[in-house]
Amino acid sequence: MTSQWRDLLPQAAAASSLDATSDASARAAQFAALQTGSFVSLASDTGLIAVTGADAAAFLHGQLTNDVERLSSAQARLAGYCSAKGRLLATFLMWRDTSADATIYLACDADVQAAVQKRLSMFVLRAKAKLTDGTATHVLLQVGGPAAEAVLANTFPALPAAALAAAHATFGDAPTSLIRLPDAGTARALSRFLWSVPVTHAAEAWAALTQAPGLTVVPPALAAWLDVHSGVARVTTATQEQFVPQMVNWEVVGGVNFRKGCYPGQEVVARSQYRGTIKRRLHLAHASGVQPAPGQALIETSDPDQPCGMVVQAAPAPDGGYDLLVEVKLAAREADDVRLGGADGPALAFADLPYEIIDPTETPASSAAAS
């Protein structure tokens, strides 16, 4: 970490802290920036694993749920890492840069990064692949809006035009990547990006963004609201080994390739898909009260002794309460009387995801045909 960014990091972290939004008008301005304006958020809740070596792609291809060998630098992909029982240990956004060693990056929840990186490293064996902490070399920023795009245009000749498209450039003498994030449905019509900034130039990038007219700094806890509305689940420590990928719509959003070779848990994932045994799915919902925690149980009032699902992730909503992604039994969702934490807990008000949940007996074209 450069001394300049080390000196600036406390200031950036303070500006990105949820405590900085205790003022109601400030929080309203931040949500306005998320919904219709320009913003930057220090993605301190996201970890990054860098994978290098001649066998990096082949190694990851045999470990993850999606095709890594045919991952081009022009695109990013979602992928999962499963246990032998087919349960997700981590969910990734992955991309390959255009540096000489074509480094592959895996962005995941910060709390699971170290353990997952260590576990993956155990299986490298004789493969020419090395996993390192990507946060030591790059800072992740979530950005969006015209003011942010004007800053990005100084580094990237063309911005990614479609969800999960990627662009690459050189910032100073270091590689930098820009990924267009999945759309956030009705929460935001404008595009948003994940910018992987070389730590050697992080202070410069942060200053350019935060000094841009019309751009608002937003805490990651609020920026997570857009992640919730994208319907792309994030596995955290509290939810590791709780879900087969289909339970969180991972194959629907393109995170599973059913035509690639084997990986840990592949037989379970494939059997669940083709036998139509998935009876739980990811849904978008709203709840009042205190902030829901990942892993918190959901209860159907007609069967209060047996949880019908759990919270995957949650974020504050603009008009109060919290929007959340929940994994829930299909039957309980249809009954539409699900509560948070107990039969007397806050009721969930379900909303539409920005994509259609495909029947589990059908192989989504986006997953099967990924290349």
Protein language model regions, located:
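Short amphipathic beta-strand starts and helix->beta connectors
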Residues: 26-36, 81-93, 122-127, 169-183, ...
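Short, conserved charged micro-motifs
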Residues: 55-60, 113-116, 148-152, 200-208, ...
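Short, conserved active-site entrance elements at the starts or edges of catalytic domains
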Residues: 216, 220, 226-251
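Acidic, proline/glycine-enriched N-terminal capping motif
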Residues: 1-78, 82-83, 87-89, 98-99
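Acidic, low-complexity central loop/insert segments
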Residues: 39-43, 47-48, 93-230
